[in-house]
Amino acid sequence: MGGMTHNLLGPEPTLLPEHTAAQAALDAGSDPATVAAEHPYYSEAWASLAEKAFEAGETVAAYAYARTGYHRGLDQLRRAGWKGFGPVPWAHRPNQGFLRALAVLGKAAGKIGETEEYDRCRTFLADSDPAAAEATGLK
């Protein structure tokens, strides 16, 4: 029997590449601003900046940092084969920077009254991996 086969399970999870130098710098306690300046593609540095700004009540700065980390992560997801949907597992450490940036983007959007963006971010995070929504508190 010939014919097409269909994958009924959906797309494979997308795993972002390791960025060992940038990760090592953050893990060693380097200032996230320094890491972001030296490794501007590294979403985790932007997510760290966004989280710190949000916790300090600097919502607009948090939004800007988070948006940068989010867009840098989207670029990398696309290069890794992501088609705009499908799982982005929280358990894979390189994915966490993007997912954390997405969460802070949603939180900051909600705080400044961007309800539609808040809802989009919340849905995107949960669709990427429910564990990410749980870990970041954006549910």
Language-model features: where?
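N-terminal alpha-helical interaction modules that lie
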Residues: M1-G84, L102, K107-K139
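Solvent-exposed loop and edge beta-strand segments that line ligand/cofactor-binding
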Residues: T34-E38, P89-P94
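Start-of-helix signal in alpha-solenoid helical-repeat scaffolds, especially tetratricopeptide repeats
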Residues: S43, H92-N95, L99
